[in-house]
Amino acid sequence: MEKEQTGGAETRVTMNNYTKEDIIRLVDEEDVEFIRLQFTDLFGNLKNIAVTASQLDRVLSNKCMFDGSAIDGFARIEESDMYLYPDLSTLEIFPWRPQQGKVARMICDVYRPNGQPFEGDPRYVLKRAVQQAEDMGYTFEVGPECEFFLFNTDENTMPTTNTHEQAGYFDIGPLDFGENARRDIVMNLEDMGFVIEASHHEMAPAQHEIDFRYDEALHTADNIMTFKMAVRTIARRHGLHATFMPKPRFGVNGSGMHINMSLQKDGKNIFQDASDPNGLSEEAYYFIGGIMRHIKGMAAITNPLVNSYKRLVPGFEAPVYIAWSTTNRSPLIRIPAAADGEGTRIELRSPDSAANPYLTLAVCLSAGLEGIQEKIEPPQSINANIFALSEKEREELHIDQLPGTLLEAVEELEKDTFIQKVLGDHIAGKYIDAKRKEWHEYRSQVSEWEIQEYLYKY
């Protein structure tokens, strides 16, 4: 339901500018029976309230109320009434549902009864950061690279980590057992207006990647949530379980969500400067500097799970060290080659797909903007394989490390008052408390590794 707009070297996807009357007409003409009002909780989980088409007038008048105290991290029971305000531009009809009695969705913002945006709504946090960029004359554009696994299910259709395939990077069928499911996912996403640039098998058995066209930050965050929902739904129809868990299997590559970022001003990519040896402008360098200053404090957002830090280890093409480069993939930040200056972008390689995309893009943008405002110079680029450097060599080059555990990441977030301010007091406090609880629950568990390692010996 989105339209492609051709301009320059790229074809971009534009948002729909639906009115209430358009929505009512489309729901009637398309025989839509149910409308899902979707929103995202603090931890990146998609939630929804389903209403019938007969309730559309109430929905479009922003009168759909729900109990915010039932959503983790939202509100206390004594102030729990919340309202869903649908973003009309996000209306989409699910292509995988029956053609009679169709199901559509609209993504919603969360508001308090007094008509004020709810400060605990992650979408509002990103909107606030985007507004700051717009006040500076910038448009923040983002292209994600979403990786996931397609695993078998058991006889009760419950998910497992089993797969019968041994396919690797760029392999095709019959080695790639998930090829049919991946193709079906792509076709359904295209029916929903996605522009799919590439899809392929990834490094690990049963691991896949689908890349869709860059867009403005809010639309991209919405698309990431839609993408994850569609991938899981279509995979299940193929008898598979799709997971965005960062490291579901030991000894193989984990799944990341690399974030490609650029800033536009007056329709031009301001990260590009043909006169610079690296093709980068001052703003691009400062943006890198801002992210590198705050990346430790951002880690609990970009890598939110205990399991996230089992991906961020040497040997599996995931970043561990805080550095940037134009020539290799071992650092945290890479500057991909661009055929023309308009494609110049900054690739942040640490985030994973378990992250809340609204909060992730908000902290990335805000850190980068602070870099521009304060003219934060990044350190010298590192064009060597950082994993091949000795500890002494890394110290001499002043190369720091990302947090090694969720606990370390939470402690870094507690120290970074700037990132806390970006999130807001409500989200920062609730998030830190929840992640500390998650860590303490994890550390009290007894793993299979411990049983195998210690039970016989001791």
Locations of the language-model features?
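A generic structural motif
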Residues: 41, 111-117, 174, 214-220, ...
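Flexible loop/turn segments at secondary-structure boundaries
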Residues: 42-47, 114-115, 150, 205, ...
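Core alpha/beta catalytic barrel or barrel-like domain that forms the active/cofactor pocket
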Residues: 141-152, 159-161, 192-212, 242-262, ...
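Short, contiguous, pocket-lining structural segments
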Residues: 173, 177-181, 198-204, 216-227, ...
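Catalytic-core signal marking the mid-to-C-terminal active-site face
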Residues: 3-4, 226, 233-236, 240-241, ...
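ATP/Mg2+-dependent ligation/transfer catalytic cores
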Residues: 1-198, 220, 240, 397-458
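Broad gene-expression machinery/nucleic-acid interaction feature
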Residues: 34, 46, 103-107, 143-147, ...
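Active-site-proximal beta-alpha loop/turn segments in soluble metabolic enzymes
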Residues: 162-172, 205-220, 249-254, 266-271
